[in-house]
Regions:
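Thiamine diphosphate
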Residues: 1-143
Length: 143
């Protein structure tokens, strides 16, 4: 799916798929494509969004995450198709805190609750992980 971005899997290595100076989305799995689509949509509003794809949580590419998240002035958003508990968002937050890097930080993830059943597009919209909802959340956080 990420072939058009020149992506090649390397164990434990995160990869910048898109550079951006206003926002950095750190994402994994399905949400990486959504992040790229949201970045493209936000560009129409002159919001420059970078996307860092994290292919593995263990080992986690801490050096790349800390370096990219530490760039001054950017909102850092972790987007994952996982619960807010025990996933990429918590791992990134812990590593940034441990490194003394404190960007504006938000998470896009599934709530820590029993979730409804249904068609995936409907659920993704309901729980805020559709492309449109990701873009809308980021616009709201930048206000």
């Amino acid at each position: 799916v990420l072939d058009e971005y020149g992506y090649r899997f390397e164990l434990g290595r995160a990869q910048m798929l898109r550079d951006g100076r206003d926002v950095l989305i750190v994402s994994s799995g399905l949400l990486t494509m959504r992040a790229l689509e949201a970045a493209q949509a936000l560009a129409a509003d002159r919001i420059d969004v970078g996307v860092l794809h994290v292919s593995t949580l263990k080992p986690l590419d801490v050096a790349t995450i800390v370096r990219e998240a530490g760039k001054a002035g950017r909102l850092v958003v972790v987007a994952e198709n996982h619960s807010t508990i025990g996933g990429l968002g918590e791992a990134v937050a812990a590593e940034l805190l441990g490194a003394g890097v404190a960007p504006r930080f938000r998470r896009i993830a599934l709530p820590d609750a029993f979730l409804d059943a249904g068609a995936l597009p409907t659920l993704h919209e309901r729980y805020g992980i559709s492309t449109a909802r990701i873009a809308a959340s980021i616009k709201g956080w930048l206000r």
